[in-house]
Regions:
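ABC-type ATPase nucleotide-binding domains, specifically the catalytic core motifs of the NBD
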Residues: 12, 92-110, 118-121, 215
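Conserved ABC transporter NBD signature motif
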Residues: 55-64, 75, 108-110, 213-215
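Catalytic Walker B motif of ABC-type/P-loop ATPase nucleotide-binding domains
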Residues: 154-158
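A short, proline-enriched helix->beta-strand linker immediately N-terminal to the Walker B motif
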Residues: 148-152
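Conserved ABC ATPase signature
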Residues: 129-133, 137
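Helix-to-loop junction immediately C-terminal to a conserved catalytic motif
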Residues: 47
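The feature captures the beta-strand-to-loop junction immediately N-terminal to the Walker
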Residues: 32-34
Length: 218
């Protein structure tokens, strides 16, 4: 379980998040809000890409507030940032392998097979340069790379931004599938409220860095 208590975070001397507190259990938790609400700042803070100015973050009863990003990953939390971070000159398989450097060879092979099971389109393009993929395909590779860490929790920061309707629907289907089949908790920030609510167990709405609403999804 992820437990967030009164966190304050931002960039330099500017606080973007103001005393946020919530828990993520074994569920899909959607974080909604307009541009500038603090969604990306929250995701980067939870992944320990941004420092805390106040408050604490605990995962599985361990304080991870002072963790570095690699320690968070080793703890079982995978982060898929909004920015397209695939390496265009590497193949799809090579991009996926980057996400599994902390695992031994046998587990890496097993995770690669599982990723291909979830994303058959990725398997068909495994030897293709990532730079030739569409935006939707690239995002699937980024998601797959997060799965390659064999995580217990995945943080997805606005993963459908800029995707075509076809890939938006497909992506949300994969999120639900992975949660159910892989026993993974998922925290997803989104502007596409309708789709996110369809798959979420709980919903949080951020407004100017504060929690405006927090409730079970309908």
């Amino acid at each position: 379980m992820l437990t967030v208590k009164d966190i304050v975070s931002g960039y330099g001397d500017v606080d973007v998040l103001h005393k946020l507190s919530f828990e993520v259990k074994h569920e899909i938790y959607a974080v909604l809000g307009a541009n500038g609400a603090g969604k990306t700042t929250l995701m980067k803070t939870l992944a320990r890409w941004l420092p805390l100015n106040n408050g604490t973050i605990e995962y599985d009863n361990e304080d991870i507030s002072d963790f570095e990003p690699y320690q968070t990953a080793a703890k079982g939390i995978a982060f898929v940032p909004q920015e397209n971070n695939v390496f265009p000159d590497l193949t799809v398989r090579e991009n996926l392998s980057i996400g599994s450097t902390l695992l031994d060879k046998k587990v890496r092979k097993q995770m690669l097979e599982e990723v291909y099971d979830v994303f058959p389109d990725i398997y068909e393009r495994s030897n293709q340069k990532a730079g030739t993929l569409s935006g939707g395909e690239s995002q699937m590779v980024a998601f797959g790379r997060g799965l390659m860490q064999n995580p217990k929790m995945i943080l997805l920061d606005e993963p459908t931004a800029g995707l075509s309707p076809k890939y938006v629907g497909m992506f949300f289907e994969k999120v639900k599938q992975i949660h159910l089949e892989k026993d993974v908790s998922i925290l997803i920030s989104e502007q596409n409220a309708t789709k996110a609510i369809e798959i979420a167990d709980k919903v949080m709405v951020l407004q100017l860095g504060k929690i405006h609403l927090m409730e079970d999804a309908a």
